[in-house]
């Protein structure tokens, strides 16, 4: 038995002076991992403007355009579905590399596309990369971050999605000045650039300590934990918690061990998730799927993907004005996502989710009402209705970004037990991308069938149902170690009790 192993076998009683803020290393890891989310954000943002020019250049129908806008999210189901098993097989780090590779190839294919089938092939390849990226970034960050800053760091993927969206909007505005048949190809092709930086950045990242423990590499896991914990005691405590969660006895402390009854390769995981889940795992799965469904079904991608169309229907007639207003949406969304990220560990997950969804409901109701009034008064310039429509688009993305945007990824990636986390998180991401694809591929048809105002009133109804679901089903997880979160789920009375306990624990930790 190694001496380092003996040192990790028990938590020593003597407290060690803090060795500087080691969370800076976790911060850097979260930044690098979350860069994968830029690729999805850029695609969402750039397609909102590029679609205007692609439709004219390739002579597409509305149905073809809808499919083109939303199909990437359907294709991403392949990547999301495979990401859980892949990340358990090759590790979280190299799964991030794989995501970047697929999107790099897809972006180049889209940039060089000469017809509709060609560009669809590019979106297929890029979609697989997006699926991998959306699952692995929050899981990796959650597993690296200490409990005290897990919410803040785990919400980074949403920040980078918004940075990507903003970059896409800005790209639209500048490349729109090029000839039509060239501009949209530059808009899409330049999306390959972030993937290159991602591949370089991954070389500086450590592997997830929880994945290393599942492989029996305790020595390597401790080195990562030691770099991301404020004290050596904290690192030892985190390692012991992970070992217990994986099922490794306390007396197994060598740097490399054979994990007893190893199930992390996938055996029994899907059975434990879907066929015979415990009450707590069933509750966790419902919470994960529910929060992902609610995030997308409340209409965020309808606004982000079709902002120019919405502003056109609201009364902004020139393409330049529509794209400028769309850039403003990106700026507001990015600013408020930063605010939400800073608040998630201070006020907790539930408070931000409930506040966010309530604000989204009021914004959607006002937006739907104003667009309905504008539609029913053709030929008239109703400045108050136009102003209300533009303003409520901004308030909708702002309130979304305060809670539903960042907290969804934080919450869904932290609640699963370590053995089920990769596959459980991948199910949530698959549903998220499926709903995003459905919204993207049906919004134009929905706005014709219900009117554009009616479509947003429908989204407002979803927001009400989501608020009730959040209030009823989601316990608070702020400040609770990952290995203890499962105990919060399973029964409502236990949830309420543990919510109070977790809040008290957080206060003690902060003191």
UniProtKB/Swiss-Prot annotation:
Signal peptide: none annotated. GO terms for cellular component: plasma membrane. The chain crosses the membrane at residues 25-45, 63-83, 94-114, 117-137, 156-176, 186-206, 284-304, 324-344, 351-371, 384-404, 424-444, 454-474. Keywords: Membrane, Sugar transport, Symport, Transmembrane, Transmembrane helix, Transport. It comes from the Eukaryota. One of its GO terms (molecular function) is carbohydrate:proton symporter activity. The keyword Transmembrane applies. It is found in: Membrane. The keyword Transmembrane helix applies. PROSITE patterns: MFS, SUGAR_TRANSPORT_1, SUGAR_TRANSPORT_2. Its main location: membrane. NCBIfam families: SP. Belongs to the major facilitator superfamily. Sugar transporter (TC 2.A.1.1) family. This is Putative polyol transporter 2. The gene is PLT2.
């Amino acid at each position: 038995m190694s001496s380092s192993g003996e040192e990790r076998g028990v938590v020593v009683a003597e407290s060690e002076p803090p060795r500087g803020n080691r969370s800076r290393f976790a911060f850097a890891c979260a930044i690098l991992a979350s860069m994968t989310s830029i690729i999805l954000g850029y695609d969402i943002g750039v397609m909102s403007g590029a679609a205007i020019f692609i439709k004219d250049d390739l002579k597409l129908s509305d149905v073809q355009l809808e499919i083109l806008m939303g199909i990437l999210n359907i294709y991403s189901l392949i990547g999301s579905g495979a990401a859980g098993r892949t990340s358990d097989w090759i590790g979280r780090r190299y799964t991030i590399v794989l995501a970047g590779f697929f999107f790099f190839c897809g972006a180049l294919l889209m940039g060089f596309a000469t017809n509709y089938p060609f560009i669809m092939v590019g979106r297929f390849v890029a979609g697989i990369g997006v699926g991998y990226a959306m699952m692995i970034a929050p899981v990796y960050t959650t597993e690296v971050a200490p409990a005290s800053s897990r919410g803040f760091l785990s919400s980074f993927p949403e920040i980078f999605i918004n940075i990507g969206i903003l970059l896409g909007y800005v790209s639209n505005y500048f490349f729109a000045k090029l000839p039509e048949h060239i501009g949209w190809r530059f808009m899409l092709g330049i999306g390959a650039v972030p993937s290159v930086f991602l591949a370089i950045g991954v070389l500086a990242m450590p592997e997830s300590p929880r994945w290393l423990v599942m492989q029996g590499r305790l020595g390597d896991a401790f080195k990562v934990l030691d770099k991301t914990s404020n004290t050596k005691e904290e690192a030892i405590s985190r390692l012991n918690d992970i070992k217990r969660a994986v099922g490794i006895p306390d007396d197994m402390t060598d740097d490399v061990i054979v994990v007893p009854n190893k199930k992390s390769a996938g055996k029994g995981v899907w059975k434990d998730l879907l066929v015979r889940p415990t009450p707590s795992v069933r509750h966790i799965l419902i919470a994960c799927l529910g929060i992902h469904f609610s995030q997308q079904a409340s209409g965020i991608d309808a606004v982000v993907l079709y902002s120019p169309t919405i502003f056109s229907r609201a009364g902004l007639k020139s393409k330049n004005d529509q794209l400028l207003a769309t850039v403003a949406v990106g700026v507001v969304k990015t600013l408020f996502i930063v605010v939400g990220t800073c608040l998630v560990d201070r006020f907790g997950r539930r408070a931000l989710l409930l506040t966010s969804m309530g604000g989204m409901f009021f914004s959607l109701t006002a937006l739907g009402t104003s667009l309905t009034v504008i539609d029913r008064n053709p030929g008239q310039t109703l400045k108050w209705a136009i102003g209300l429509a533009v303003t409520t688009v901004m308030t909708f993305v702002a309130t979304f970004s305060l809670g539903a945007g960042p907290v969804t990824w934080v919450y869904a990636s932290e609640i699963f037990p370590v053995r089920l986390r990769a596959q459980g998180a991948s199910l949530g991401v698959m549903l998220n991308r499926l709903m995003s694809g459905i919204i993207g591929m049906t919004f134009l048809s929905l706005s014709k069938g219900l009117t554009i105002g009616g479509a947003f009133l429908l989204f407002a109804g979803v927001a009400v149902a989501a608020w009730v679901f959040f209030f009823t089903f989601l316990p608070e997880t702020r400040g609770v170690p990952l290995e203890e979160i499962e105990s919060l789920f399973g029964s409502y009375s236990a949830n309420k009790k543990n919510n109070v306990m977790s809040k008290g624990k957080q206060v003690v930790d902060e003191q």
